[in-house]
């Protein structure tokens, strides 16, 4: 038996086509459709689309905070992958009808020792979504995060919301396949998303109460 990989020849094991195909399938099955107003998704290949949000320009945010031996350079850039499928994609919202907005948290803000008492989206992201909507754009939000986030400040302005988590090596390909309709976003949330940070902490083993000092335990 030879249970260990020859460290001198990693290319014989890592990033093989068959492994990347499995990674893409797992990533596609992890994406959750949270909103799809007027069936805006899937997007047509000829749609006039633009791209916004710094989160989507970093391969590190696609990998997540536990990539182990995975390298950000192993990921295809999301913007370039989008351009391959959507021929009229622009980085200027002035030339588009639909804006794909990347919102959420950077990958280094999740994981051990990264607790937050406020899980609202950053104010600059909220301002970006509202400003684009004020220009009459349809908003397709890609939510990149490793924890539940409060979406109450942006949800009314979004026409579609896709929870895309941290999908690993084949993140860009899986996201584009979902946006284009090649893949069906069949994932389910594994946790509750509060409307606002004021709802946390959320307990599952007791009834909520407005009065302090007593707890609403189940009998």
What function would you assign to each model-found segment?
Residues 5-219:
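C-terminal non-catalytic regions of proteins with extracellular/luminal or membrane-system context
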Residues 1:
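Short, surface-exposed polybasic-aromatic patches that bind anionic ligands, especially phosphate groups
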């Amino acid at each position: 038996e030879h249970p260990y990989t020859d460290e001198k020849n990693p290319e014989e094991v890592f990033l093989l086509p068959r492994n990347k195909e499995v990674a893409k399938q797992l990533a596609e099955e992890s994406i959750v459709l949270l909103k799809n107003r007027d069936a805006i998704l899937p997007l047509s290949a000829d749609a006039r689309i633009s791209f916004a949000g710094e989160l989507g320009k970093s391969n590190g945010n696609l990998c997540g905070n536990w990539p182990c031996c995975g390298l950000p350079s192993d990921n295809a850039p999301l913007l370039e992958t989008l351009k391959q499928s959507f021929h009229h994609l622009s980085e200027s919202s002035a030339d588009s009808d639909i804006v794909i907005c990347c919102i959420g948290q950077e990958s280094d803000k999740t994981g051990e020792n990264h607790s937050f008492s406020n899980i609202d989206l950053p104010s600059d992201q909220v301002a970006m979504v509202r400003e684009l909507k004020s220009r009459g754009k349809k908003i397709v939000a890609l939510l990149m995060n490793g924890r539940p986030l409060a979406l109450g400040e942006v949800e009314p302005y979004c026409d579609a919301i896709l929870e895309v988590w941290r999908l690993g090596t084949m993140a860009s390909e899986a996201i584009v396949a979902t946006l284009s309709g090649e893949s069906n976003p069949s994932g389910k949330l594994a946790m509750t998303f509060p409307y606002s940070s004021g709802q946390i902490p959320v307990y599952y083993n007791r009834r909520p109460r407005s009065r302090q000092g007593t707890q609403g335990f189940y009998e």
